[in-house]
Amino acid sequence: MRWLFWSSGSQQAPNNNKDNNNNNNNNNDDDDDNNNIIIINNNINRRPPLTLECPSPSHPPCASCSTKATTFPSNPKRGWNTSLTARDWAGEFKDPRNLIPTLLLTGGILFCVRIHRQYLRRIPLATNISPTYFHKRSLFGRVTSVGDGDNFRMYHTPGGRLAGWEWLPFRRVPRVKKELKDRTIHIRLAGIDAPELPHFGRPAQPYSHAAHTWLTNYLLNKRVRAFPYRQDQYGRVVATVYVRRFPWIFLRRDVGLQMLRAGMATVYEAKSGVEFGGEGKESKYRRAEEMAKRRGRGLWKGWKGAGWESPREYKNRMAGVEGERAAAAAAAAGVGGMGELGVNGGKN
């Protein structure tokens, strides 16, 4: 039995040796295939490939590994000081990583410039207002002084608090009169006419001081919004003005309409050049004036009595008086000239 086991084992040994020889042959064939190096020329860079003794780019090389992998050189990185050709410049500019940020930055700058010119540019004087503002745009600012019962001066603050006015250090409204010179817009309330204060040698009209005091208390140091219509012959801007007052800060009030209701002004009467901001506003103004008349408010107290005159009648009367004075002065100058001429003629 021992001989049979040995003999059977001796018979299987040649087969095992044959299998081992086959396996060794296969391994040798694999090694020969792996040792073959494939060289591919780069058509763009015209550089030969580099070979690394590494089985895979994802695995580090080892001492027992003799497999060679083929890699290809990449384009060298350019520095900031590297000179570029025209072709390189075109390629760099068309790169989306450069083109898209450039377009976004340029568009953003142009948009900011347009917004600043249209909405955030401060207007110092009434004469600097573009005609495109009339009947289309508005002016926002703080009232710095009240000159009469129907006009005041405003410091333009475009954008208001959202643009930094009143809380940023470099966006403060000046308080000193000297600093406000040639930096405020002279506004005349549209559609109303208040009693005249004494000026240009004319006496004060009744209720002129009351109207001036009322408007000063109502507007001075307040933020207002004016809708300009045109410029008058005195360089002022004729505009409808709105203001928000505590506690009704969410409701804006028409300043001219409030003066008519208080009896501190009349509806503006003139043959031409009257601005109301629309027919609907004119009818509203006339209804407010009629209500103040019936209730006898302000300058309408005793208006049916003798000697009462409206601001328009006062202006017409003073214009007539000044015309008579001018005619008398011209006549006196003419008589004096004739007398001197006669004296000189007698001497000759």
Swiss-Prot record:
Binding site residues for Ca(2+): 193
Pfam families in the cross-refs: SNase (PF00565)
InterPro entries: SNase_OB-fold_sf (IPR035437), Staphylococal_nuclease_OB-fold (IPR016071)
GO molecular function terms attached to this record: endonuclease activity; metal ion binding
Region named Disordered: 1-37
Ranges annotated as spanning the membrane: 99-115
Subcellular location: Mitochondrion; Membrane
Enzyme Commission numbers on file: 3.1.-.-
PANTHER family: EBNA2 BINDING PROTEIN P100, SERINE_THREONINE-PROTEIN KINASE 31
Annotated protein name in UniProt: Probable endonuclease LCL3
Protein species of origin: Paracoccidioides brasiliensis (strain Pb18)
Gene name for this UniProt entry: LCL3
